[in-house]
Amino acid sequence: FMTKVESTKIGDSMRHDDVLYGPMLSERYAKDFLRDLGMCETSGATKLWGEGMITDDSKPTNFVGDASEGAYMWPHVYADVTEDMECFHEEIFGPAVTVVKAKDFGHALHLANASPYGLSSACYTNDRLEAYRFKSGIKAGMTGINNSTTGAEAHLPFGGVKGSGNGTRESGIWVIEAYSYWHAVNDELSGKLQLAQMDVDEVHIEEADADYAGLA
């Protein structure tokens, strides 16, 4: 994993097709990301890789282009993250990974569900039983088994739970439910006023009892 991180190619994707990611969307998002990196470090996490914003004086070997043309960020990896740390419970929007060690499967599932967010989840394993245990126990709107969220599955509902998303499931056939409501219509064609189901005064109990007696 660290080898992949260290060899990540960063730059302007409009000029270079093989870069993994480009600059931050805006200066405000760049500042928010740098603030979150500081939160990781003050929480006590161990930084394995990353040097904040990419500059001409501080840039990865595989950076291509002019660092002054955008808010480019190093990829960051933080280890030794625990459940009591602030960075464990926050969404960091940018190239950063926080690594949490789990004791076993149950503990890993607990850690995943301890997040206040639940948009997407993923489980990588060769054990199908473990994968389906994860699928049944995870509190998230989407789950990938040996696959990450692609965001382009038009036939599947998209949405999250807890603090993620607005709860709707837009995409697939479920989009009809998201943007419509049920309307019940009873069209009487006999020309007679029909009794409602709760109008029981006209029910002939004696005849009903006789019918049941005949069946007996």
Predicted regions and their residues:
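Short beta-strand to alpha-helix junction loop
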Residues: P23-L34
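Short secondary-structure junctions
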Residues: G44-D57
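Generic structural signal for helix capping and beta-alpha/helix-loop junctions
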Residues: R15, D56-D57, A131, A152
